[in-house]
Amino acid sequence: GIAAGVDMFDCVMPTRNARNGTLFTRFGDLKIRNARHKTDHQPLDTTCTCHACAGKPSGPSGSAGVSWDAGGRGGFSRAYLHHLDRCGEMLGPMLTTIHNLHYYLNLMREIRDALDAGQFAQFRAQFKADRARGV
């Protein structure tokens, strides 16, 4: 991985997993097909600013919306995405793919920032702790 010097990734994992109902979040993987999401009205990831989680960008030059944790209430709920998946609606995999790609783009940006700041070891430790917490 990155700690060993790998600096480029080319993989279908984010899109394939999204189409099959597995979504990546800061706190672990979320399986949208799980019945517990049927009535869950929070976004996939409350810290995420992608279109699926946070809705439309704020402002004309914004590239992302406002996360749930930052007070935003746009985006789509886990319950709605669960419903889209269960009924085979094409919007479901489109939104989940947007989310997974945003997650990976943001993760790589955070890693580059940590490397530039000489804080990759701290970033890596926090990343592992967050993922171990669970969704």
Regions found by a protein language model. Give the residues of each.
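Alpha/beta catalytic cores of nucleotide-metabolism and tRNA/nucleoside-modifying enzymes
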Residues: I2-V135
